[in-house]
């Protein structure tokens, strides 16, 4: 009985385990009665501490099993000892015939040895490369050597850990994490497991060392194997040879791979270096430079971002010269234009006004540019800046040595120019005409026929219906136009035409509300008064210049950009509609139109905290304020616990939590 009990001791305890170990009988549980024995008499099984845990005393079978032995212990066994074992196995039978001293016990020992031998061989066949590598690594890896616990007996090492860990799932001493912590995308965070521990200088040297060591071991084994010509010995030798050869091959392959990878890296770096004449410490400009060199259309963006922000909108201040732009640099705006792009179109792209279908080609874009220029001329305003054509760009490149510095200078100019108000007006006016719908030709025709103000009005009126599909939409477009942002976030006061602002907000909201935001983040607007208000705002728009301009503005960028919405939004919200305006809170909180009510209204939330103090949120809803908190609480209990009441899903959904959750024990006790 006791042996069985010992095997299972480290599993769940019985109630008897809590008695003091002195009084537990020999077959009993506590320490098995063994605690008071002096462990010095049993050196082969000695434990680290004099208090002997029954879990450390394991059945004999397990102590002899080589698989539980820690690699350190196995490493310290000398080759002579191993050869001795082998000799016993091979020649035992013949010796048994001659000498009478071979008792049954020794024979049993031999059979055990033989058994273990086969085990070991199978194991090696299963994982040939692993075992040697692990040993060698153990000896190499200094950190592991320092951290490894001193092992007196392998069984104790194995079990005591198990014993202490029984309740926790966590590993006791996790390996030190060697991976480089980096936020940059280009460096892969988890490197290949083989390269992790090696510094590049050490790699080859260590490989060499390992091979030398392997050779030495083989020599020793050959010497010791000289005497024995047994089949098992031969087999083991062959296994070993095969193993070492395979490991060597693997090492060679790894080396080759590493070399190839390194060469690729070097080439990449060289390519990066080639285009750069003068670098202004901004990574953006490097990417622009490369783009101009290789004629790629992708990384043209960053420069345009910086120039496109107006001072109020840009996320990084202007003084940090676009070093830390937010993370929409990679792949958000997908405008494909071939060759050089002039600054104007790049700005349009950054603002999100320029919609390019996959089919459009250069001349269409040029047409649109020409239209905008003509309209500016008709306006009678001296045109401030011509859209930059590729020839101009080339001239610039010839005049000023490096185009990276050139782009820098251009950006500075833009900054200076941006500060002036007339530039604001011009910028505000032009986008409405530049707006390009997916039904490209129709919109262009309508724009061509109408005059300027009419086009603005039509843009506000007709294009509201066009809600972009996910494909055309750019969720993380760079920051939008300044006016639009103030439009979303303007308070009640602060601007002269606040009324027109609110009406415009409703227009924009109406765009999104009908099938826009699927999540509960309150970014869709209740569209109660929106139609009338929209009509009113359209009529009233010519009244004041600011309102008209901002009106066209609102129609220009349908989709507010992520960055221009400074409000917190929850991440489940894919489509960001503008948040409801603070001014129009007169309408009811929850509108019950089909558009606004996307999911069924949830039951009112009850807080976990001090339930007693809340007057409005309790089950009754229309309960009188004057009823004391004690009575209300009692009623609460009665309602909840009444057996005859049909339990609905909502009751089961949020069970009443215990007092320790509320954190205000004294309060809740007072109320009881």
UniProtKB/Swiss-Prot annotation:
Q: Where is the composition biased (Acidic residues)?
A: 322-343
Query: What is the purpose of this protein?
Result: Together with unc-5, involved in touch neuron axon guidance. During gonad morphogenesis, plays a role in the unc-5-/unc-6-mediated migration of distal tip cells along the body.
Question: Lineage of the native species?
Answer: Eukaryota, Metazoa, Ecdysozoa, Nematoda, Chromadorea
Query: In which tissues has expression of this protein been reported?
Result: Highly expressed in intestinal cells, lateral hypodermal (seam) cells, Pn.p ventral hypodermal cells, and spermatheca. Expressed at low levels in the ventral nerve cord.
Main location per UniProt? nucleus
Domain of life from the UniProt record: Eukaryota
Biased amino acid composition, Gly residues: 25-34
Q: Name one GO cellular component term.
A: nucleus
Q: Which GO terms describe its biological process?
A: dorsal/ventral axon guidance; locomotion
The segment annotated Disordered runs over 1-463, 576-672
Where it sits in the cell: the answer is: Nucleus
Could you tell me where the Low complexity compositional bias lies? 87-105, 307-317
The UniProt regions of compositional bias labelled Basic and acidic residues, in chain numbering, are: 8-20, 62-85, 107-138, 189-226, 234-268, 289-306, 366-375, 382-396, 410-424, 436-447, 607-626, 636-659
Q: What keywords tag this UniProt record?
A: Nucleus
User: How is this protein named in the record?
Assistant: Protein seu-1
